[in-house]
């Protein structure tokens, strides 16, 4: 199915997901993913996959809720980084409470982001709804209901940012 999505969604094309040195990406996933996400699962979904996802509810089996609930309930936004490159892809919750973010994510089975939570500098949506990073990381899919809703694999956004020297930060 080919379609376009309304702004602020930024469309991309198939060339983003062309074959590169490591599947659809230039690099494999980072070795020390956040929230105890499984690196093997992450590498398979991020770099060698176009249609599959981590199983529904996988994100609840990680340490995400244990580690982030206090921050979220205190009104702090959570940054989600590309598991390959460490680039900032999503920041949530924005324009809603942490509880609303978790409730929607629980209802759909994957972390669910809205337009205001997407960093459009690094995220693109392909005409079939596949949501990817500009570097070729498979993230998930746009499944619009009332508005655009991005159901994203936690293993795809469990990366760590890089410091000013390009080194992966070990703590956040």
Predicted regions and their residues:
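Flexible coil/turn and secondary-structure edge motifs
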Residues: 1-172
């Amino acid at each position: 199915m080919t379609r376009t999505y309304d702004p602020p969604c930024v469309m991309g094309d198939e060339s983003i997901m062309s074959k590169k040195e490591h599947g659809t990406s230039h690099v494999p996933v980072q070795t020390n993913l956040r929230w105890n996400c499984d690196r093997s699962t992450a590498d398979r979904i991020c770099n060698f996959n176009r249609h599959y996802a981590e199983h529904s509810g996988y994100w609840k089996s990680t340490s995400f809720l244990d580690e982030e609930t206090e921050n979220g309930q205190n009104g702090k936004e959570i940054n989600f980084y590309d598991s390959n490159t460490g680039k900032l892809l999503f920041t949530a919750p924005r324009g809603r409470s942490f509880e609303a973010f978790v409730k929607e994510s629980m209802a759909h089975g994957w972390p669910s982001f809205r337009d205001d939570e997407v960093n459009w500098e690094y995220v693109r949506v392909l005409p079939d709804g596949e949501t990817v990073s500009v570097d070729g990381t498979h993230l998930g899919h746009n499944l619009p209901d009332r508005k655009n809703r991005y159901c994203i694999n936690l293993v795809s956004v469990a990366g760590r940012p890089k410091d000013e020297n390009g080194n992966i930060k070990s703590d956040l």
